[in-house]
């Protein structure tokens, strides 16, 4: 074998560890003639986490295969996706992403000089690109645009036009970046097939699409920037890494939905081609695995203990993160990180309260006083057959009276002594003569027969514990929500139950210090 890899060897490097390839025959033809031009794009929204090492390891493979690789910081996409990145923060977020992605690549030994970096707004605001957006919008149906973005663009009841434009812009990027292939997660598949359908209608060629698997989070679900307990941030301290791994789901012998084992498979093995289990001599001493399936087999047979697996992952992961932490331990990058991701709960109070501003009032979930409650008693409302009157302990000197319309949906005995989730800072309201001092939050699904389930706080929760949306735990709730301002109603529009039955606001989990708030079974339900 010579120094330069053969087309077959290049194909192996490009496609290994991928979940799916669309256009493999075209890929083979290109590799016979010249080097492949490929790009990977990332919308500059939430902070990148350790699962980003999966695309980084593939970028290393692409370079080994001789590919010309472009990394796109999709700043405009970050804004179009329900303004996940506010316009005024776009430049800062993009700078943060560029610095952290480059630090990740350096951490795994990827030469940066072989890569091209670009921003979406470097070319997406040009006359030619804008004209193509209009041309494409005249051909694409609303149905196809919404379907294409279903796994990527935030889904809301009343979608913004910007979110429908998102897939079209991503398709056009393939043409304007002059690439043969686009690389992304399997969650991008619908956008990729959208591009294959519509680019030829503009006279542009169909591209190859390369897809890596989505990395399960430490809780067993997909690793997500919006689930604090499911992911490890690239700048997490060593003690935070230890804490998150210690709490991660890793049942002895269970290889299904095992977030720690999956992390080894999808992140650590592709980067190092081996993994060492570190353990005391009395338990067999250290053992090196060069084939992932052998590690999985030993774990299933309980030859490898969860504690040893977690400790070994912790050591390996910190080796990857140390160079990134060191790079960001400078005043300039510390300042960049705090400016790009400002603490939403920080306010400047005055002696007379918050200063009045001409800016629109900030509608954020930390304004809601949501707590764990325990139902001490349940009675039928004396004047309304559909209402219960509950006495609920929410951590105050006296229990609160809460009226809820659950008679048709939840038997009285299921509510007695149950832990529930209560919104405590609504203005008290008379309901058929009884003052209701809160709202018992429930999941619901509409249909032929409406289904309703009270939200459940994590097991072991205590009355009065605060329920918050991850990232907004430090904010102070309003003393009382003013009905005219409709703060709760505006926030509630983005309340939803995930496919894992977790309560969310804008795809970010409701949680307590013990874990996530959930419901029993109503996937995709609303919350009220």
Swiss-Prot record:
List residues of the tRNA-binding domain.
364-468
Which residues are recorded with the post-translational modification N6-acetyllysine? 197, 206, 474, 482, 490
Q: Does the keyword field hold Amino-acid biosynthesis? A: no
The record's listing under InterPro entries reads: aa-tRNA-synth_Ic (IPR002305), NA-bd_OB-fold (IPR012340), Rossmann-like_a/b/a_fold (IPR014729), tRNA-bd_dom (IPR002547), Tyr-tRNA-ligase (IPR002307), Tyrosine-tRNA_ligase_regulator (IPR051270)
Q: Where is this region: Disordered?
A: 339-363
Q: Which residues bind L-tyrosine?
A: 39, 166, 170, 173, 188
- E.C. number, please? 6.1.1.1
Q: Which terms does the record give in the GO molecular function aspect?
A: ATP binding; small molecule binding; tRNA binding; tyrosine-tRNA ligase activity
Residues the entry annotates as binding trans-resveratrol:
39, 170, 173
Copy the domain comment: The nuclear localization signal, which mediates localization to the nucleus, is also important for interacting with tRNA(Tyr), suggesting that it is sterically blocked when tRNA(Tyr) is bound.
Chain positions with N-acetylmethionine modification: 1
Name the record gives this protein: Tyrosine--tRNA ligase, cytoplasmic
Q: Which Pfam families match?
A: tRNA-synt_1b (PF00579), tRNA_bind (PF01588)
Single GO cellular component term: cytoplasm
- Output one GO BP term: tyrosyl-tRNA aminoacylation
N-acetylglycine occurs at 2
């Amino acid at each position: 074998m010579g120094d330069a890899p053969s087309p077959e060897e290049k194909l192996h490097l490009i496609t290994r560890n991928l979940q799916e390839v669309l256009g493999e025959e075209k890929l083979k033809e290109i590799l016979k003639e010249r080097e492949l031009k490929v790009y990977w794009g990332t919308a500059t929204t939430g902070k990148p986490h350790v699962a980003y090492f999966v695309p980084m390891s593939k970028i290393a493979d692409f370079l080994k295969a001789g590919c010309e690789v472009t990394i796109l910081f999709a700043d405009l996409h970050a804004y179009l996706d329900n303004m996940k990145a506010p316009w005024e923060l776009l430049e800062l977020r993009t700078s943060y992403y560029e610095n952290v992605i480059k630090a990740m690549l350096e951490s795994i030994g990827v030469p940066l000089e072989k890569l091209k970096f670009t921003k979406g707004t470097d070319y997406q605001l040009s006359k030619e690109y804008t004209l193509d957006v209009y041309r494409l919008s005249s051909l694409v149906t609303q149905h196809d645009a919404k379907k294409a973005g279903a796994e990527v663009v935030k889904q809301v009841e009343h979608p913004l036009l910007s979110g429908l434009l998102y897939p079209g812009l991503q398709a056009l990027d393939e043409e304007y970046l002059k690439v043969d292939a686009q690389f992304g997660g399997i969650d991008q598949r619908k956008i990729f097939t959208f591009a294959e359908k519509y680019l030829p209608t503009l006279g542009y060629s169909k591209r190859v699409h390369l897809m890596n698997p989505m990395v399960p989070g430490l809780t067993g679900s997909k690793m997500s920037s919006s689930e604090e307990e499911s992911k490890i941030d690239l700048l997490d301290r060593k003690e935070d890494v230890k804490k998150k791994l210690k709490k991660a789901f890793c049942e002895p012998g269970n290889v299904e939905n095992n977030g720690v084992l999956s992390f080894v498979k999808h992140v650590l093995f592709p980067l190092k081609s081996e993994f060492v289990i570190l353990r005391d001599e009395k338990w067999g001493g250290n053992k090196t695995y060069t084939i992932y399936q052998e590690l999985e087999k030993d774990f299933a047979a309980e030859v490898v203990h969860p504690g040893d697996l977690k400790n070994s992952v912790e050591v390996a992961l910190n080796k990857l993160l140390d160079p990134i932490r060191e790079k960001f331990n400078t005043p300039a990058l510390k300042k960049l990180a705090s400016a790009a991701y400002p603490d939403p709960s920080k306010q400047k109070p005055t002696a007379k309260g918050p200063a009045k501003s001409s800016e629109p009032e900030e509608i954020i979930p930390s304004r809601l006083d949501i707590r764990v409650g325990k139902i001490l008693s349940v009675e039928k409302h004396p004047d309304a057959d559909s209402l219960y009157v509950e006495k609920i302990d929410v951590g105050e000197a006296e229990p609160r009276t809460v009226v809820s319309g659950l008679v048709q949906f939840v038997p009285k005995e299921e509510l007695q002594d149950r832990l529930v989730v209560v919104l405590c800072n609504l203005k008290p309201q008379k309901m058929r003569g009884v003052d209701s001092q809160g709202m018992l939050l429930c999941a619901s699904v509409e249909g032929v027969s409406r289904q309703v389930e009270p939200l459940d706080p994590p097991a072991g929760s205590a009355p009065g514990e605060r329920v918050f949306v991850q990232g907004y735990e430090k904010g102070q709730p309003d003393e009382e929500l003013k009905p005219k301002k409709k703060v709760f109603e505006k926030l509630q529009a983005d309340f939803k139950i995930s496919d894992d039955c977790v309560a969310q606001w804008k795809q970010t989990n409701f949680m307590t210090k013990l874990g996530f708030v959930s419901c029993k079974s109503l996937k995709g339900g609303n919350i009220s």
